[in-house]
Amino acid sequence: MIVNLITTVYNFLWGDLFTIPLPGGSSLGISLLILLLIPTGIYFTIRTRFLPIRLFPDMIRALSEKKNEKSSLSSFQTLIVSTATRVGMGNLVGVVAAVSAGGAGAVFWMWVTAIIGSSTAFIEATLAQLHKEEDPLYGGYRGGPAYYIHDLVEDHLKKKKRYVLPAVLFAIAGLICWCGISQVISNSVASSFKNAFSIPPLYTSIMLVILSAIIVLRKNATVKVLDFIVPVMAVCYFFITLFIIAVNLRQIPSVFARIFEEAFGLRQMAAGGFGAVLMNGVKRGLFSNEAGSGSAPCAAAAAECDRPTKAGLVQALGVFVDTIVICSCTAMIMLLAPKDLIDGLSGMDLLQTAMQYHLGKFGVIFIALTLFLFSFSTFLGILFYARSNVAYLFGDKWCFQTAYKVLALVMLFIGGIAAYTFVWDLGDVGIGLMTIFNIIALYPLAGEALSELKSYEESKKS
């Protein structure tokens, strides 16, 4: 029954809301999430006057923002936390899923989602800074969509309330999403460790749960661990990919030609596959870079900044790093492998086969260990996100914080032996519901973030 419910909600969010006829008798299905994300990204890109391109140097400079309070986080640390979840499983498993289902053209639509999504990420992160509050449990600050949605409804009603329904629904959707992601984490790691080391999924799941519990059940260990893991894993993965690209340099032009040809190709339209290309690219782009979903603002709110705009710029940069850089690395690893070698494969089997082609047995081991680190950091990152949502729903009580962590650890264990499609659908349902509630709030609140952006740019001139 639960599986049927999840499938029904998944189809409502990601299934075809309506179709657009295409040449050759085929059609393009447009889902509710596509209808929300693409126009929203374009709208905010125009309203911010193409911020991702125009203010890219400012994004880099914002990383140097210093903090004054010991218990708070710097802009760079909040980027590390959000990058832990962005540069995580979505960059490996997500890209594999997108290319498996939608072909090479899905990579292009992931890029598009990232470019226009950077502006959305800026708006939501800036709003999180504007509506943050002090965190009496962990120290520093907390916030996110549940908090700015709450303030929006309170302003509309012109009265103080303990809870408002849209904020409650967002917080619940977030907790569902992160439980779903917890399952995907162990599912993917267990699969890769079985292929690389012949370790049964049960043992891998137990190991992952124990290591995670050691970190997450301690008060403020999460950020300290992520500060070390995230830069190391991202740099190692990037340079291994550069090596593979250098070895296969002559094939690069044909790979890019394939990406663009399949993104717009008449062959895909005629076969009715263009919708799958677009849908899988955008869906996996969202799952990877989180722009518009409301996840990253939970980290952005924790930053100590002299201007809220700087937190927004940092999170916009995070979207770029995640999708344009790291996701492209995974795509190149797959697309530089012979097509007949990986045809019929999916998930981690596909990626490990591609890595084995490039680097031999070392490639299989490397991708298994990389996935483990990416997934481990993702789990730590999503539990950081969950703090503010648990606090919004249940108040400043440690028992509820601990209870959700234990629930997530249980889901982490279950995911190692669960069906692949089911766990992806649960994560997609959660992130889809979050996106709906978040985007509905962004439009009436965007003026606050745009006003901050205008003030920031005027201060640069003076």
Predicted regions and their residues:
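Extracellular/periplasmic helix-exit of transmembrane alpha-helices
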Residues: 124-136, 242-258, 272, 302-305, ...
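Helix-loop-helix module between adjacent transmembrane segments
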Residues: 40-45, 113-141, 150-187, 191-215, ...
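N-terminal alpha-helical transmembrane segments of multi-pass membrane transport
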Residues: 1-89, 99-106, 117, 413, ...
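Flexible loop linkers connecting adjacent transmembrane helices
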Residues: 50-75, 97, 103-104, 119-160, ...
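Alpha-helical membrane segments and immediately flanking helix-loop junctions
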Residues: 69-101, 127-130, 137-153, 169-172, ...
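Membrane-interface loop-to-helix entry segments
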Residues: 36, 44-60, 166, 187-193, ...
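Selective recognition of specific alpha-helical transmembrane segments in multi-pass small-molecule
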Residues: 116-124, 204-219, 230-250, 283-286, ...
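Transmembrane helix-loop junctions in multi-pass membrane proteins
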Residues: 47-52, 91-95, 177-190, 212-225, ...
